[in-house]
Amino acid sequence: MPFININEIKPKEVVPGFSGRFIHSEHTTVAHWEIKAGASIPFHQHVHEMIVNVITGKLELTVGDETKVLEAGMGAVIPSNVPHKATGVTDCKVIDVFYPVRQDYNN
């Protein structure tokens, strides 16, 4: 089925304040996040390449040792196995693209 209504996908709270709806293809995962102000994902890393796209609000993102507050229209490219963390400065919506598929989000 090539067409998806993201609103029909049940959200999954991965950590408190980070709720995601996930779309999977054969090779990629797209995560539609709703992030609450003050919610954080601590430093972590994974084998997946990741592209971050802020849609609304503000997100503080640290990649390696560099930190920036991203606003709507801004993003970041995070290579495989690079430590990163994120905090909602405001309530925000973010779309992340992962390669390869995030099997841990595929349930």
Language model segments and positions:
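Ligand-binding loop in jelly-roll beta-barrel domains
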Residues: 80-104
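A cytosolic small-molecule/anion-sensing beta-strand core signal
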Residues: 55-56, 71-72, 90
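Conserved short histidine dyad/triad with adjacent acidic residue
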Residues: 29-45
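A short, N-terminal "cap"/entry segment at the start of jelly-roll beta-barrel domains
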Residues: 1-27, 107
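Short strand-coil-strand connectors
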Residues: 26, 62-66
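Short acidic-glycine-tyrosine-enriched beta hairpin
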Residues: 65-80
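Short, conserved beta-strand element in jelly-roll/cupin
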Residues: 34-35, 46-61
